[in-house]
Amino acid sequence: MAAKDVKFSRDARERMLRGVNILADAVKVTLGPKGRNVVIDKSFGAPRITKDGVTVAKEIELEDKFENMGAQMVREVASKTNDIAGDGTTTATVLAQSIVQEGHKAVAAGMNPMDLKRGIDLAVSEVVAALGKAAKKIKTSEEVAQVGTISANGDESVGKMIAEAMQKVGNEGVITVEEAKTAETELEVVEGMQFDRGYLSPYFVTNADKMVADLEDAYILLHEKKLSNLQAMLPVLEAVVQTSKPLLIISEDVEGEALATLVVNKLRGGLKIAAVKAPGFGDRRKAMLEDIAILTGGQVISEDLGIKLENVGLNMLGRAKKVSISKENTTIVDGAGKKAEIQGRVAQIKQQIEETTSDYDKEKLQERLAKLAGGVAVIRVGGATEVEVKEKKDRVDDALNATRAAVEEGIVAGGGVALLRASANIKAAGANADQAAGINIVRRALQAPARQIASNAGAEASIVAGKILENKGATFGYNAQTGEYGDMIAMGIVDPVKVVRTALQDAASVAGLLVTTEAMIAEAPKKESAGGGMPGGMGGGGMGGMGGMDF
């Protein structure tokens, strides 16, 4: 086992504090509408420019092991906030730095660290409750746009685009952010159920210009296995021909004789038909076929259920107003499924999302949920250069997360004002002087975000904080973008409660642990061995080679 280096009390805390400060100082320059960018060197490709706190934090690794421990603990704050709320990482870092700095001073002055931590926890739980009470629910699309705009650093076009996407796909719908191939940023909404499988043969195309197969008011046959023998399909094909409606076949695969016969019938004009492979693989394929069945009001034809293809009647087929199939995708619009059954399926998938521990499964379940609940919107972020696109994509991601959080738990005044107000309204009293000091540490820390936003905008932080606190209006604050004071909510400067709450809870949890640290252990740096004379002469006379050793 390698030798360890151990540091105690003041020495340990000072080294740790240095690490915390290095990381927090790099992150906090990005806070607020006038926050600056950070350039990160990449081992390959162009440097990355970002204003996203967690991206900056994740890049920082310090040489000194003890300083690095402090930095990594604060990095954990940013990552945790990012995982839960998706935004507010810089605020969380600023709060954590302030609590650690003030806590360090208090411990150095001889206070009991455990009591300080109790005081910190008391104050934080009171502030979280107060934020919940002050929250204002979001009702209009304009309010959604405001949240998005603030989080995208005052970029109104991003806010509007996110509001439009949410309006179209609903709060359950999935909104994804991709890099565009052009310089324009655009929004594309896919309504209905879309999956990434195209037609099995180009002969199924109905619109040769666009190379798509459009089926209006179609029947949909969902089959779990491969279809290679046409004989079993004849009864159902004949029944569909009688109705003169088109048919879409979704199965694991259609091959050989079956595919050839379908194509020939299509070309002769007797049968309006198209076939696609089922989406997904393994168990997920079964689940997705079930989803399509519920959406279209049909049944999955499966040997497991004892349903044979020969016995399938029209009543087992799904129905949809329109099906559009391109080379890569199939979209089913307006399925004939019952509302109650779709709702039941949505609730079931939500339950699975709650229970799963794998991020990958969660993402896939969320996609399925969106396809059932309303559709998928894609925001394609464009820019003149790759570096610009990446920077903008970071902001759009943040804005999207903030908007979701706002819809979930409501909004409070932005610009650090909600926390600043909370600092003046903490009523909790500690059981002793040290706990009271812990409560005061949180009081001071709650002012840090508003002060940092002001100083990043070139204003004097103390004057701004003083002016805001003098005015008793709950939403009165400082607009760093214009340099004016006024009602933050009226000016559209709002923060999601979830983001502010998560930032404070995560910051206090990690900072509280750092304050109570008394010893630190890290691997000792390896000492380089002096002069290399030993191996050379060993073979000579006995120990003759030792001459090179430098005692």
From Swiss-Prot:
Reaction catalysed by this enzyme: ATP + H2O + a folded polypeptide = ADP + phosphate + an unfolded polypeptide
Gene3D superfamilies per the UniProt record, alphabetical: GroEL, GroEL-like equatorial domain, TCP-1-like chaperonin intermediate domain
Keywords from the UniProt entry: ATP-binding, Chaperone, Cytoplasm, Isomerase, Nucleotide-binding
Residues that hold ATP according to the record: T30, L31, G32, P33, K51, D87, G88, T89, T90, T91, G415, D495
Molecular function GO labels: ATP binding; ATP-dependent protein folding chaperone; isomerase activity; unfolded protein binding
Annotated localization: Cytoplasm
GO biological process, any: protein refolding
Chief location category: cytoplasm
Superkingdom of this protein's organism: Bacteria
Gene Ontology CC terms: cytoplasm
CDD domains: GroEL
Family matches, as Pfam families: Cpn60_TCP1 (PF00118)
Enzyme nomenclature, EC number: 5.6.1.7
HAMAP family (alphabetical): CH60
Subunit structure: Forms a cylinder of 14 subunits composed of two heptameric rings stacked back-to-back. Interacts with the co-chaperonin GroES.
Described purpose of this protein according to its UniProt entry: Together with its co-chaperonin GroES, plays an essential role in assisting protein folding. The GroEL-GroES system forms a nano-cage that allows encapsulation of the non-native substrate proteins and provides a physical environment optimized to promote and accelerate protein folding.
Entry's family note: Belongs to the chaperonin (HSP60) family.
Name this protein carries in UniProt: Chaperonin GroEL 4
Species of the source: Mesorhizobium japonicum (strain LMG 29417 / CECT 9101 / MAFF 303099)
Gene that specifies this protein: groEL4
